[in-house]
Amino acid sequence: MSNAASERTAADTLRALAETIEQRRGASADTSYVARLHDKGLDAILKKVGEEATEAVIAAKGGEREQVVYETADLWFHTLVMLSASGVSVDEVLAELERRVGRSGLDEKAARGE
C-alpha cells in the first residue's frame, strides 16, 4: 500500500470513488461501465444493487472471508452509483451514519415510528 493510500481515511476513499463515478458518469458508455449503468437508468442500477446485495449475503453465508470482502466492495461500489443517480452525496450518508454513532438502533427505529 502506498504512503498516500495508507493516510487516506475510509471516508476519503468513499469520496474519491464517488468523485470518480461522477466523472465517468458523463463518459461514453462504450468505454465506461459507470456511464453504461447510468445510461440504462435508475431501475437498472437498482437491479444491479439488488444483485450485488444478494451476492454479498451468499458470500457471508458461505463464510469465505475474501469473498465477503470482494462482494461487499461490489455492493458498496454499486451503491455509490445508485447515490450518484439519485443525486445523493457520500457526505450526506456519512453525516447520517455519524449522527447514529452511539445511538441505540432500537431508539433510532422508535424515533422513526417503526
Curated annotation (Swiss-Prot):
The gene is hisE. HAMAP family: HisE (MF_01020). It comes from the Bacteria. GO terms for biological process: L-histidine biosynthetic process. The keyword Lipoprotein does not apply. Its main location: cytoplasm. Its EC number is 3.6.1.31. Pathway: Amino-acid biosynthesis; L-histidine biosynthesis; L-histidine from 5-phospho-alpha-D-ribose 1-diphosphate: step 2/9. The keyword Cell division does not apply. This is Phosphoribosyl-ATP pyrophosphatase. It is found in: Cytoplasm. It catalyses: 1-(5-phospho-beta-D-ribosyl)-ATP + H2O = 1-(5-phospho-beta-D-ribosyl)-5'-AMP + diphosphate + H(+). It is an enzyme of class 3 (hydrolase). CDD domains: NTP-PPase_HisIE_like. Keywords: Amino-acid biosynthesis, ATP-binding, Cytoplasm, Histidine biosynthesis, Hydrolase, Nucleotide-binding. One of its GO terms (cellular component) is cytoplasm. One of its GO terms (molecular function) is phosphoribosyl-ATP diphosphatase activity.
